[in-house]
Each structure stands twice: as structure tokens, then as C-alpha cells.
């Protein structure tokens, strides 16, 4: 299974600092983190590309809250979507990671283009 689940999925709550979100991104190695609420519902996403833009704008990683710099219109998919369809979404949107949710918008996993490549699915 190419979908990362459980502790392998980078996720933080909206009230953490950018610094804490970066630790989560680094620890999980996906180049992004999901932002979730207390019920694990997806609120947004923050990527390494966003980090470059945020730092370029002069943000302080110790005081900036992730809620102030996250993207709320992130692309998601469902666990029953075929890998080929997930790859189409990634390529069409020029993104490298895709959050996976259930029908209620709860985070259940993440897909990464490099994982799909490693599994020979592209």
C-alpha cells in the first residue's frame, strides 16, 4: 500500500508555530504537513514550497502560527481512489503530495509522488 497512514502522516494543529510544523515536516520526510483540528479534520496544508515563500516574506518561524500561513484549499482524495487517479490529480495540480480523507473530511493518510514512483506506479 502506497498510502502513508498513522504516525507516518505529518500533521499538526492550527495553533502551533511554524517552527513546530517544520519539525513535523522534517521528522516525517514528506515535504509537507497537514493542518488538522482536534477531531483530525483537515483544515489545510503547508508545504516546503510554502516555507520558501514564507521565509522570503520575512516571517519569524518562532512566532508565526501555522494557521496564518497554511493553504486551506488543499487537494484531497479518498482511500478508495486508484493510484493512477491520484497520480493524475498530482500531475494536473503540479503538486507532490495529496492528503487522503474519509467522507467526513477526516485525515486518514497521505500520498506522495515519490512513493508512487518507488512502487512503479508511474
Language-model segments: residues:
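Short hydrophobic beta-strand segments in globular cytosolic domains
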Residues: 9, 42-43, 101, 107-108
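Short alpha-helical segments enriched in small residues
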Residues: 53, 60-72, 79-83
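The conserved cystathionine-beta-synthase
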Residues: 12-29, 36, 55, 76-95, ...
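Bateman (tandem CBS) regulatory domains
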Residues: 1-9, 63-74
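Conserved active-site beta-strand-loop modules that form the wall/rim of enzyme catalytic pockets
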Residues: 30-33, 43-44
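Short hydrophobic beta-strand motif reused across regulatory alpha/beta modules
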Residues: 44-49, 96, 108-116
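A short, polar/charged loop-to-alpha-helix boundary motif
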Residues: 50-64, 116-122
Amino acid at each position: 500500500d502506497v498510502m502513508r497512514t498513522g504516525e507516518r502522516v505529518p500533521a499538526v494543529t492550527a495553533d502551533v508555530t511554524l517552527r513546530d510544523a517544520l519539525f513535523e515536516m522534517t521528522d516525517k520526510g514528506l515535504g509537507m504537513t497537514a493542518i488538522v483540528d482536534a477531531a483530525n479534520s483537515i483544515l489545510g496544508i503547508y508545504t516546503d514550497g510554502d516555507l520558501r515563500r514564507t521565509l522570503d516574506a520575512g516571517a519569524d518561524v518562532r512566532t508565526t502560527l501555522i494557521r496564518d500561513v497554511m493553504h486551506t484549499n488543499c487537494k484531497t482524495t479518498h482511500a478508495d481512489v486508484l493510484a493512477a487517479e491520484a497520480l493524475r490529480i498530482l500531475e494536473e495540480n503540479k503538486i507532490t503530495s495529496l492528503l487522503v480523507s474519509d467522507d467526513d473530511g477526516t485525515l486518514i493518510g497521505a500520498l506522495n509522488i515519490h512513493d508512487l514512483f518507488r512502487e512503479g506506479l508511474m
